[in-house]
Amino acid sequence: MTQDSQIDSLLPPLRLNRRGFIATAVATGFTAATGHAAAPTAIRTPADGLDAGEVRIPAEGGEMPAYRAAPQGKTGLPTVLVINEIFGVHEYIQDLCRRLAREGYLAVAPEVFARQGDPARYTDIATLRAEVVDKAPDAQVLGDLDAAAKWAAGNGGAAGRLAATGFCWGGRIAWLYAAHNPELKAAAAWYGQLRGKPDALRPVYPIDLVNDLRAPVLGLYGSADAGIPVADVEAMRKAQAQGSSAARASAIEIYQDAPHGFHADYRPSYREEAARDGWRRMLAWFADRGV
């Protein structure tokens, strides 16, 4: 199984760079390469009433940029770490942070590819993957999420109320993080890869970790996903039933006829009904677990 078919539906038409301006080069390059145009369904969540923007987070090797959004002037907030697709913390990911902030969360999306490069500079998928995404070790990414969680706890987040959600590439990481951080209370993985060929940088996949899960995960998948067969999802369900207590408490929802990237409202892959239902389920999943 390759990730190319998964990624095709997620190509972003535009991105806000780290200073908040529109980076049109990536949009032009990706659109030219794929023939896709921006979907009119793209959601734009306003930042009024929120503290939203770039922050710098102490991490291994220096500072890591991140986007954060929270209700303005509030503290003691439940925290959600938002884990990006291969395109970094572009406008869609930032908008998800603002949506979560409007639900009362401190949402933090760390730039976990900052050491490898800026995804906004790339105009073709193969080069982006080879030079940035595939060079980011799981261990580094999980450490960066730990750094983001620590930063959040000292900047308005409530201790003991931590969740994570990830999309596509980040969906796989969300599963891994649920096995990594004992302080995580819940996670939601949107169409994250469940099986794959291990290598030095990616030694395990979610299906390998069912005995190690420390937090229950809500998996959100589509039956028409070209890169993640329903057979893989069903295999994960079966493995969970024999895994740790957190694995047995996890759940997977499969949306009929939904493709990969069905939550990506800026792409033709967007399926509003499935996206809205998945978001509702995610919020309830977090709330039911004290986040």
Model-derived segments and spans:
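Primarily recognizes the serine-hydrolase "nucleophile elbow" in alpha/beta-hydrolase
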Residues: 147-209
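Gly/Ser-rich "nucleophile elbow"/oxyanion-hole loop immediately N-terminal to the catalytic nucleophile
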Residues: 123-165
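N-terminal export leaders
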Residues: 16-31
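N-terminal cap/lid segment of alpha/beta-hydrolase-fold proteins
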Residues: 40-72
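Short beta-strand/loop motif that positions the catalytic acidic residue
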Residues: 213, 219-221
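C-terminal catalytic histidine-bearing segment of alpha/beta-hydrolase fold enzymes
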Residues: 246-291
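N-terminal secretory signal peptides
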Residues: 1-16
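Short beta-strand element of the alpha/beta-hydrolase
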Residues: 77-85
